[in-house]
């Protein structure tokens, strides 16, 4: 069995020890505490790198110590030529990199009407043009407070999260204080480094409170699944130590930023990952163009490779043709309008796709074609060259991402829930699957309608009215009074607007629950009161209250 350890190794300091949620494994008696969670699934094992703690790898708080790490005149290769790392470049980094202090809290997974204890964590960030600070989304996810401290200062400045891109694990902070910006210099984005290029990771990792720098070499460039979002995007692997707390800090090559530090490989020494500049620019451009809507392109289909000779022959591919075979297409996607099952995608925007699903990247490097797809904006189209029953066709189609049936991750939002007769209904999410006995089969399914959700009975708050129903925890609700359930809001509406004495719910595996409507409503009120639950329904499901204030008509002019 392969293992995936997703560790949020942010250092969490409990602000209320007695309220520690069950999913936190608290080690030792002294605060601060470290929150760690594990799950089994895949061989891709990585960890986040936000932290707050003393460490043995800190650098001296002086510029001279950093200069020892980054000697002037040190030669490193760039994309086209070699550049010299000068003292001015080091000084620029010192006057740009900041430490980010975050207090966060999120809804409990199984009691969504409650929030977890507040926790403190830290990460890094750096100044970019426009008086903005770039950091990781996971550094400020579910934040209730964000503060920033610059190098050489003891003052923490209040920061505002201006924009977040959870897909790409990036965020922008703003600080409305002129004193903070005194002496601060923005860093400039560079190009993707080449293999064996030397880079320097600057930030505030574990082990101390001062700025630190570590040196590494680029060992690999290619898409990976970002741990924060589960989205597959381009990343750069380096052998520099990206420790807890480095998240959000710049990785410098020459006098420019090569990427943002954000992950490292569990149980491996000096294998770190950085977000490259094409992903950063895509994020920044999206913020500039649409405010807060940050999304990356998606192929919205499943496919298989065409390595087998007989398979290529049966699908009428010539010896010169290469591509991938379409297995299933998301019915809500734009490509569903032009592509068909068993089509062979030969090329995207004129770039041939190999039988192994790779495309040419640079020199002799190849990466998955998904990188070309991910860099598409929602408003852009791609030219798809397709082989269908032996004939070649070309189609223009948008590659706008379609929300999955089961969300991978959810941040910065209140949880949805509905309680009726002691039954707690929730929309199924991947974190819920990872923390329960629910089958992962729903993860591979595609939505048939926009807004569709898998609604489950998360738990049953015991009462005489639901006796015998506890065995149906984690079961999906298929129908309410014979009507197919579209999502949680639809279920809420079907139950609340019930006109019959009995509410019937058809579950998966052909199981059935029935409740007397009036009795269930009374029991719900009793349960809410006894368990101190503020409401039977989350705010997002409640109908918006219309403004009942009567408008005062304008006074008529006297003639």
From Swiss-Prot:
Bias kind Basic residues: ranges = 546-559
- Which sites are catalytic? 138, 169, 247
Query: In terms of domain of life, where is this protein from?
Result: Eukaryota
GO terms for MF: serine-type endopeptidase activity
Which segments carry the region annotation Serine protease? Answer: 100-292
Record-linked SUPFAM superfamilies: PDZ domain-like, Trypsin-like serine proteases
Asked if Transcription regulation is a keyword of the record, the answer is no
Write out the GO cellular component annotations. Answer: mitochondrial matrix
Mention one GO biological process in which this protein takes part, according to its record: proteolysis
Q: Where in the cell is it found?
A: Mitochondrion matrix
Cross-referenced InterPro entries, in alphabetical order?
DEGP_PDZ, DEGP_PDZ_sf, PDZ_sf, Peptidase_S1_PA, Peptidase_S1_PA_chymotrypsin, Peptidase_S1C
Q: Where is the transit peptide?
A: 1-48
Write out the ranges of the annotated region (Disordered). Answer: 59-81, 538-559
User: Which family does the record assign?
Assistant: Belongs to the peptidase S1C family.
Query: What's the stated role of this polypeptide?
Result: Putative serine protease.
Question: Can you say what this protein is called?
Answer: Putative protease Do-like 3, mitochondrial
Q: Which organism is it from?
A: Arabidopsis thaliana (Mouse-ear cress)
